[in-house]
């Protein structure tokens, strides 16, 4: 998936290792970017399988600046999680950098499940976002961009004979 780039392979291993820890050694928002058919989804599904109940999937709207809710209930599902994944961002999505920094920064957030009481959430999840397009974010938000890591998935497997059972094999 990395096209043989040893540095990217090592970084993916380090990131996966971070998801095994109860604390968060670094504030990282990892974007996996590629044109499709490049292994992003297989990689994410594999790490989600390994982590089991320690991972959660968020909708792309969770980090959208057009979201209307003042206290989002979707981040409540991050309680006790070590990995939060988001897949397939729309091309025109504008990132709510405050929300993303809140998830990735480790500061206590106010959260609630739908129709339930508010509670304090101390997010520990690493944020992993797979997309074909890098979303727009306020270019002046230095704290957001300090956290962002971009990893390109340059190999397209649809040009070759793809292993249709690879996801199952990796489990």
PLM regions: where:
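Conserved AAA+/SF3 P-loop NTPase catalytic/coupling segment centered on the Walker-B
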Residues: 80-106, 119, 137-144
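Short acidic (Asp/Glu) and glycine-rich catalytic loops that position anionic groups and cofactors
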Residues: 24-27, 77-84, 127, 153-165
């Amino acid at each position: 998936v990395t096209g043989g780039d040893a540095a990217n392979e090592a970084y993916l291993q380090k990131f996966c290792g971070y998801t095994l820890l109860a604390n968060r050694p670094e504030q990282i928002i990892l974007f996996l970017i590629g044109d499709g058919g490049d292994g992003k989804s297989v990689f994410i599904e594999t790490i989600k399988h390994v982590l089991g109940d320690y991972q959660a999937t968020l909708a792309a709207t969770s980090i959208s600046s057009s979201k209307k809710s003042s206290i989002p209930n979707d981040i409540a599902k991050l309680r006790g999680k070590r990995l939060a994944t988001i897949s397939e961002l729309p091309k025109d999505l504008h990132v709510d950098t405050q929300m993303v920094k809140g998830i990735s920064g480790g500061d206590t957030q106010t959260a609630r499940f739908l129709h339930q009481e508010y509670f304090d959430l101390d997010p520990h999840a690493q944020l992993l976002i797979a997309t074909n397009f890098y979303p727009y974010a306020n270019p002046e938000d230095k704290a957001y961009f300090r956290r962002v890591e971009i990893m390109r998935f340059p190999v397209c497997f649809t040009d070759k004979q793809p292993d249709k059972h690879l996801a199952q094999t990796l489990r």
